[in-house]
Amino acid sequence: MTTAAVFGSTGAVGGQILATLLASDAFSSVKTVSRRLPNAQSPKLQTLEEGDITKWGGLIASLSPKPSIVFNAVGTTRAAAGGIANQWKIDHDLCIENAKAAKEAGVKTYVFISSGGTRGFFSRYVPYSKMKIGVEDAIKELDFEQAIILRPGLILQREKPKAALLENIVQNLNKLGQGVQDMIGQDQTVIGRAAVAAARMAEEGKAPSKYWVLEQADIVRLGRDEWKQ
């Protein structure tokens, strides 16, 4: 049985990761670290509420039993953070600090929810893309026993859409064919399931590489087409 910890469990994808972990018999214990407690409840769930995000990384070593897998689904927007500088502190600095703390604590598998399109020629100069690239590169350099990076497209079916009009347009693209929508956006549940499925494969020694990047097609395949509870 496996123990996992989730950062960002109150967000769209993080919440789906948490729900999937709690529903899976493969995980005996699930921990969360967040500024506010998640709504989920389960006998195997242990929640830690910490308003000071600079303390999050240090809490990993205090978790018992120690998680073998850590999921990082932390993310915010420029508007919610109050500017690009504050967003950088969360989407870049905090994520790297948590990854370093996980490595020091002996975590075997680290799963990071990044974003699709960040490595494009023009997008790499966009601040948001630079944040994600910085975190991805830092995780790779930390040399975890297994690192998994998910690069989803537009996140769909969120309870509180961040770009309601755009998300609604992409959501309706399935009328032209599911494959059309899949190239642009993925359901939050599918992304969460893909993250857990990939982590389970890594635990079973079935990951295709030590540093495994899942693009949008991979996310759809693992989180929907091949998904098994």
UniProtKB/Swiss-Prot annotation:
GO cellular component, one term: mitochondrial outer membrane
Membrane-spanning ranges: none
Claim: Mitochondrion is one of the keywords in the record: yes
Pfam family, one: NAD_binding_10
Name the UniProt record assigns to this protein: Protein fmp52-2, mitochondrial
Top-level lineage group: Eukaryota
SUPFAM superfamilies according to UniProt: NAD(P)-binding Rossmann-fold domains
Organism: Aspergillus oryzae (strain ATCC 42149 / RIB 40) (Yellow koji mold)
Localization per record: Mitochondrion outer membrane
Keywords, sorted A to Z: Membrane, Mitochondrion, Mitochondrion outer membrane, Transit peptide
InterPro entries referenced in this protein's UniProt entry, alphabetically: NAD(P)-bd_dom, NAD(P)-bd_dom_sf
PANTHER family noted in UniProt: OXIDOREDUCTASE HTATIP2
Main location: mitochondrion
Chain segment of the transit peptide: 1-45
